[in-house]
Amino acid sequence: MFKRLRRLRSSENLRAMLRETRLNIDDFIAPLFVIESDSCIKNEISSMPGVYQMSMEPLLKECEELVGLGVKAVLLFGIPKHKDATGSHALNKDHIVAKAAKEIKKRFKDLIVIADLCFCEYTDHGHCGILENASVSNDKTLEILNLQGLILAESGVDILAPSNMMDGNVLSLRKTLDNAGYTHTPIMSYSTKFASSYYGPFRDVANSAPSFGDRKSYQMDYANQKEALLESLEDEKQGADILMVKPALAYLDIVKEIRDHTLLPLALYNVSGEYAMLKLAQKHNLINYESVLLETMTCFKRAGADMIISYHAKEVANLLQRN
């Protein structure tokens, strides 16, 4: 006797009723890039078609469209006019992301604004903090990250997302926020972030490529599974409210491993290189793009992700509304 498993696949309605993993637009976070400019700017990135550097008005228009589609959250990255060795623009109370957060919350009070907390977009060397002897100083970087986090919390950001991969960054930030009265501001930590070649196109849009070396001394080795789990569990211990794995496609084993060891919400970042690959395949008619897109996003959830940060968020929202 054998089990006839095909019985439960015999019709579309039966398959739909028994589907274990379902996509919902509430799962998605849309990353947005705001550029400091006195002009109206909306620059499409050649390596990421459909992704733009936007000044304030186009950014607000994009938020309006996302809200109309049911997207509940955006993740902001800033592109300043001025960069220097210490990323001092990020410590200005009127810096580009702080201003954008204020404007978004004025117009769309229910839209969740998440701010990336790092210095690579603000430093002239493209590394994620203060340099000492051509290396990023962990503890000095924590000091300025805390200041940046406080400015963003004061500007009305709903969630802070430290992406710097400095040791102790979650505990240090949590203490700073709590001492300033921001006890209800959650931290979504980039808890397991790999030193990955999949980030290539992001550095085009954020103008954040390192001017020398790489980030392997602070971002994780992609060969390591146990260390990946340790990083996220350590951030949970330090007080992270949400954990994250970045990148996504080649790291679903890591997502599953962390999911099995934590009860915290788990985000996954579907990064620029992954986005660009699907877009290139679409351009050359190599795949059924919409089917592959929905399959990919469903597999992210099946692996254990509760939230999906993706440049495809708007496309997925449109597809889910149609279907």
Swiss-Prot record:
Binding-site residues, 5-aminolevulinate 2: S272, Y311
Enzyme Commission number, as recorded: 4.2.1.24
Residue positions binding Mg(2+): E231
Active site residues of this protein: K193, K246
Keyword vocabulary terms for this entry: Heme biosynthesis, Lyase, Magnesium, Metal-binding, Porphyrin biosynthesis, Zinc
Biochemical pathway: Porphyrin-containing compound metabolism; protoporphyrin-IX biosynthesis; coproporphyrinogen-III from 5-aminolevulinate: step 1/4
Full protein name: Delta-aminolevulinic acid dehydratase
Primary role: Catalyzes an early step in the biosynthesis of tetrapyrroles. Binds two molecules of 5-aminolevulinate per subunit, each at a distinct site, and catalyzes their condensation to form porphobilinogen.
Source organism (scientific name): Helicobacter pylori (strain ATCC 700392 / 26695)
GO biological process, one term: protoporphyrinogen IX biosynthetic process
Subunit structure: Homooctamer.
